[in-house]
């Protein structure tokens, strides 16, 4: 459904471009004292094309770990020995189903730094969309079901002594802060993948003189390091 919606939006963008309706992204918006008219709203919606070329398969499908009866453990045996740090990675809907390349990249980085990446069994939603939409009961049920499942994972893998829960989505971060993970994995903390990589000393080499701009999203995942 999302794929077809994106296709329709990109088609509308191309049609608007041909008609000269698309505005420059650097153009100063006109002054307004009230609600934008329908024409302005439509132009704003199609003024920039939605992304295309989304992954056809999720990272779980690519790694053949979709079975919700198993708890996947991903590690590099050459780097992750018996004393390697284990982290619990919660991908969420966005990083797993919608933009699967984000989830795959996160797992690849954990693999690269020599950590053991523990994934939840099966596809899971954090419950934020339901709660934000006013479906409090549905959202609370998801939270409760997930916490019960995570307790089972913690008990099964207690020998790994998981002390870090990693996320790659700021919205999931906000929701998971309500999960009381310190009572699931005793003594654990909740970190964004970038904060975790910062702790591991991961850097980009050969970028002298290159400047970057970082956009901090509304649901910022940076809760520990500023």
How should these model regions be labeled?
Residues 1-226:
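Iron-sulfur cluster-binding electron-transfer modules in prokaryotic oxidoreductases
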